């Protein structure tokens, strides 16, 4: 499968689009299916795991990727945007 066109955008733009399209709300209320990729120990926070998480629509289409660092109790130390797919274009955080 060919790679989709990708445009680098500043973090502020990607954060704005996540807010504008309610991506965070959709992640938290379960409207998007979230699948973490195997995590690694965090280099910043002891006893925490850093994960890349892919977020999908119910039909299986990948629409966003985030980076999350949390501990075993579920406390989130850091969670930010990585990319957003709009139609057939990927917006990647520069």
What are these regions (language model features)?
Residues 1-94:
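Catalytic toxin/effector domains delivered as secreted proteins or via bacterial secretion systems
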